[in-house]
Amino acid sequence: MSTNNMSDPRRPNKVLRYKPPPSECNPALDDPTPDYMNLLGMIFSMCGLMLKLKWCAWVAVYCSFISFANSRSSEDTKQMMSSFMLSISAVVMSYLQNPQPMTPPW
């Protein structure tokens, strides 16, 4: 057994324990895409509700899906779910007020 320890090239006094870097110095962990999409979803939801534009309501649903897909599991989901429900309600209300199919905005 002592021969095995003598042939081991590792030096136990040089072993350093791994410490993860703080999140403030790692810009890759601070992805602002979910926050931007959440804000855009709320803006488009309000435009869809107030201006009765169906395409704005659908863009809000799309932005909410992107925000949900890009978020981290450690984030609080209350704001994201409220944005998602606001966008769904914008679509529902715009089709309740005018049930005709959506006309393209161009």
Swiss-Prot record:
Ranges per topology, Lumenal: 52, 96-106
Transmembrane as UniProt keyword: yes
Originating gene: WDR83OS
Localization per Swiss-Prot or TrEMBL: Endoplasmic reticulum membrane
Family that this chain belongs to: Belongs to the Asterix family.
Residues in the signal sequence: none
Taxonomic placement: Eukaryota, Metazoa, Chordata, Craniata, Vertebrata
Associated disease: Neurodevelopmental disorder with variable familial hypercholanemia: An autosomal recessive disorder characterized by global developmental delay, motor and speech delay, impaired intellectual development, intractable itching, and signs of liver dysfunction including increased serum bile acids, hepatomegaly, elevated liver enzymes, and gallstones.
Full protein name: PAT complex subunit Asterix
Species the sequence originates in: Homo sapiens
Residue ranges of the TM segments: 33-51, 53-70, 75-95
Regions of this protein lying in the Cytoplasmic compartment: 2-32, 71-74
